[in-house]
Amino acid sequence: MIKGIQITKAANDNLLNSFWLLDSDKGEARCLAAKAEFAEDQIVAINELGQIEYRELAVDVAPTIKVEGGQHLNVNVLRRETLEDAVNNPDKYPQLTIRVSGYAVRFNSLTPEQQRDVITRTFTESL
C-alpha cells in the first residue's frame, strides 16, 4: 500500500519537512521533495530514512497506462476470395462490412487502393 507523508521529525535535518511516498509492500520510499541529500524521484529503502516521525497526507494515486509498444488487432472473419470477388463484383456485396482501425466500414465504400490495402493487410502468409 502506498501512503504519502511529510516528515516532521528526523535525526537527519535534510529530511525535516520533506515529502515522500512510502510503499509498504516493497519497503521503499520515493522522494517527492527534500531540502538536500535526496533527489526528486529517488527511491530508497524505508529504513534508510532512519528514525522519523511524520504526518500522513492524502494521496490520489492514479494507475498509469503505457501506450507505447501496444498492439492493435482487427478481426475480420472471411475468406480472401470473398474480398477479391467484392472488388470485382461490388453489386453482389452491398452489405459487406469489415473492421478497419477499430471502426466498421462497408467494403464497397473504400477506394480501390484502400480495398487492396485491406486485402494485403488481412491475409498474410505468416506472422
Curated annotation (Swiss-Prot):
One of the record's GO molecular function terms: formate C-acetyltransferase activity
Modification Glycine radical occurs at: G102
InterPro entries for this protein: Auton_GlycylRad_Cofactor, Form_AcTrfase_GR_CS, Gly_radical, Glycyl_radical_cofactor_GrcA
Keyword hit for Cytoplasm: no
GO cellular component: cytosol
Pfam assignment, any one: Gly_radical
Domain of life: Bacteria
Keywords (A to Z) from UniProt: Organic radical
The keyword DNA repair is assigned to this record: no
Domain Glycine radical: 5-127
Role description: Acts as a radical domain for damaged PFL and possibly other radical proteins.
HAMAP family: GrcA (MF_00806)
Protein name: Autonomous glycyl radical cofactor
Lineage: Bacteria, Pseudomonadati, Pseudomonadota, Gammaproteobacteria, Pasteurellales
Gene: grcA
